[in-house]
């Protein structure tokens, strides 16, 4: 099995991020089990910093 560039082509088979239940963004990491945008699954508090300009979008699409 080769390592390096040929192996990177096999990384696109599974979805890394799916839609988050709390913030609605496609930032919930399936294998890690938490959202990169709002921190759902890692903490009860919404991930928020003073240097960021994000709004929490709780509307669900169906």
Curated annotation (Swiss-Prot):
InterPro entries in alphabetical order: Ribosomal_eL37 (IPR001569), Ribosomal_eL37/eL43 (IPR011331), Ribosomal_eL37_CS (IPR018267), Ribosomal_zn-bd (IPR011332)
BP GO annotations: translation
Sorted UniProt keywords: Metal-binding, Ribonucleoprotein, Ribosomal protein, RNA-binding, rRNA-binding, Zinc, Zinc-finger
Gene it is expressed from: rpl37e
Record-given protein name: Large ribosomal subunit protein eL37
Gene Ontology cellular component terms for the protein in this record: cytosolic large ribosomal subunit
Binding locations of Zn(2+): 20, 23, 35, 38
Free-text remark on how the cofactor is bound: Binds 1 zinc ion per subunit.
Organism of this sequence: Methanopyrus kandleri (strain AV19 / DSM 6324 / JCM 9639 / NBRC 100938)
Zn finger (C4-type) location: 20-38
